[in-house]
């Protein structure tokens, strides 16, 4: 009986071993070329750094299958214009003011439309050189659109041969990929009235900050209310200011000079520093007695502004903080 059981077990092991050899030694899936994207054919996982010389994003072509290719596979791309229309219809219907746009030609270079997926590899990365991103609006959505040339790349997946490459941008202070909010702390907005009295508001809300260039951001000048950011573009354009960071302060290496500028038509005047409202950017590290540290990116501002020439100036003393983890940002 023991001999019979031994024979059965040995036979089973031989069969399993044979199956393992078949599973791992042979290709189990058809090899097809795909363009990396989500279920909506959008690829939005990359962010362009606003910096001198621009930055590089990639359109990624991948090869399906359980085994790496043993010979090069040529992938040829083409420009396309079908997905953007569908994207706008699906997301914004007839609200044309919010339609996504193609990135202007002056803002990118696409050096090659043909690459190989090398033998032993599973992907090819088409570089997109981005530049002049400070010229595009932080309030608009921008894409580049490509598709696989199926005549010159015959083994492509027809369901994954198109891609919309979303153009996000960021600098050290803010990003368009995820909304960046700075919180008002110990801030006041002084609103004069024609009768000579002034109303003092103490905002405790947050202010969304947008990257403009490598060293500048945009934000609302005051505490004006608007119900929905996506429908308040005119108010935002008229009521926004630019903060432009400059040289490091010699007396404090964690602080930088800061200049306050108009974004569009707003009348803004940078005022003489008062106490901690000294028109600087500060990397503020607050330490507790037990040794823990909390890190803030902080704008310390003193200015006045008005939206129309007939308005009285509103004076702002603001400290805007954004808490962050430097270890996470440096990953």
Where is each model-derived feature located?
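C-terminal motif of bacterial Sec signal peptides marking the signal peptidase cleavage site
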Residues: 15-18
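Intrinsically disordered, low-complexity regulatory regions in eukaryotic proteins
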Residues: 20-112, 125, 129-143, 149-331
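Beta-strand-enriched, solvent-exposed domains that form extended recognition/catalytic surfaces
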Residues: 118-125
